[in-house]
Structure formats: structure tokens, C-alpha cells
Amino acid sequence: MSTAIVVFSGGQDSTTCLIQALTQYDHVHCITFDYGQRHNQEIEVAKKVAIELGAASHKVMDVGLLNELAVSSLTRDNIPVSHELQENGLPNSFVPGRNILFLTLAGIYAYQLGAEAVLTGVCETDFSGYPDCRDEFVKSINQSLVLGMDRQLEIKTPLMWLNKAETWALADKYGKLDYVRNHTLTCYNGVIGDGCGDCPSCDLRKNGLDAYLENKESVMADLESKL
């Protein structure tokens, strides 16, 4: 029996990963991290979506210490989410160490459950400039977890080389485009579905959806060539 863990936020990307994983593994468990994020409504959304889609279990883990250590517009209500890059070349929504912590804890959880894979929705194509979403980083932490726990584990990134239009196409391939569009929370300002329409996350989501809906056959063909 195959088992996987999905690092799950209830957003477009992780929900699409969950939808795909449910067709590929016998048991799929979700893990969501509560770090006092600005859009903390995502935790309730994640709970609802995990149940509705049929995850075997859903664990919410308190990692509030990350909020104390990592200053970001996603961890501080008094820091507005900006469309501009900071002096260090990163968006102010970058939470230092977030995916290092999340993937490490997900790896430990996989060890506990005997899961062979951890899935995460990070990608390098339409990403927001976060260094911990790069393929190089994921491969590095995967190797460290295998060495540190002396157990085989694969961190899978189904969306790594997909653009946002292709991510929408992937949801549509499994008949879940409308579900992902209407029930997930990607917006930094906590607006479910199509979002606030103003934050960087909503821009990426909308632009990708528009690109897919305008040229579905071509985008789906591009997706199929990458699967």
C-alpha cells in the first residue's frame, strides 16, 4: 500500500497536488502548518478542503515559533504586502526558513506514518521569487532528510516546471478546475476563491487562469508534454 504526505495550505497549488496524489497513492495524508500567518483563515479552508477531497487524515501543526523569528508581510499585520522587491531582491512576503521547516517536519511525519513520499506545491516558473521554492533547494533538503533519518524518502514537486496556466490545466485534467477556483484560498488578504484581485498571489492566480481559459487546448497539450 502506497502512502504520501501533502504539505497542504488549502491554496490552489497544494490542492492541485492533493487532487493528483489521491489518484496515485492508496493513502494520502495532509499536514498544515499554523505559524500565525497573515491569512490564517487558510487553516480552516485547508481542513474543509482536505475532508471534501477525501484525504485519509489532516494534521494541523503549531509552528508559532516561526512567526517570532521570521519577519515578513505574511507574519506581521502591520507590514503591507508589497508588489515591489526589497533591497535584497526578495518580495517582503518571503518568510525565511518556512519551507526548510515545513519540509523537515513533513519528512519526520512521513517517517512516523511510513510514507514514502512528501508532496509540495512549490515551483520555479511562476514563483514569487522565494529561494526555498527552487528545485535545487528541494533536492538538497531531500538528501539531508534521507541522510539524517537513514530512510528512503522522496520529496516530490509535481508543479515545479509548470506555469500557472498549466497548473490550472492540471486541475481541469482531473475534473476539479471549478472546485479549485471556488474553494481554495491563495489570496494574501484572506479572500477565498478569486481573491482580492490586488495582492501578488492573486495576480499570479488570475493571470494563469485567464491564460488557460483563453487557450485551453494549447495549454493542456503543453501540460501533457510535461507529465
UniProtKB/Swiss-Prot annotation:
Q: Which prosthetic group or cofactor does it need? A: Zn(2+)
Citing just one GO molecular function, the answer is: ATP binding
Keyword ATP-binding on this protein? yes
Q: What is its EC number?
A: 6.3.4.20
Residues that coordinate or bind ATP: F8, S9, G10, G11, Q12, D13, S14, T15, T16, C17, L18
The enzyme's main class, written as a single word, is: ligase
Cofactor binding comment, as recorded: Binds 1 zinc ion per subunit.
Q: Which reaction does it catalyse?
A: 7-carboxy-7-deazaguanine + NH4(+) + ATP = 7-cyano-7-deazaguanine + ADP + phosphate + H2O + H(+)
| Keyword Iron found | no
Q: In which pathway does it act?
A: Purine metabolism; 7-cyano-7-deazaguanine biosynthesis
Which cysteines pair up through disulfides? They are: none
Positions with a binding annotation for Zn(2+):
C187, C196, C199, C202
Q: Name one GO biological process term.
A: queuosine biosynthetic process
Q: Which UniProt keywords apply?
A: ATP-binding, Ligase, Metal-binding, Nucleotide-binding, Queuosine biosynthesis, Zinc
- PANTHER family reported for this sequence: 7-CYANO-7-DEAZAGUANINE SYNTHASE
Family stated for the protein in its record: Belongs to the QueC family.
HAMAP family named among the record's database cross-references: QueC (MF_01633)
Main function = Catalyzes the ATP-dependent conversion of 7-carboxy-7-deazaguanine (CDG) to 7-cyano-7-deazaguanine (preQ(0)).
| Annotated protein name in UniProt | 7-cyano-7-deazaguanine synthase
Lineage, uppermost ranks: Bacteria, Pseudomonadati, Pseudomonadota, Gammaproteobacteria, Vibrionales
| Protein encoded by which gene | queC
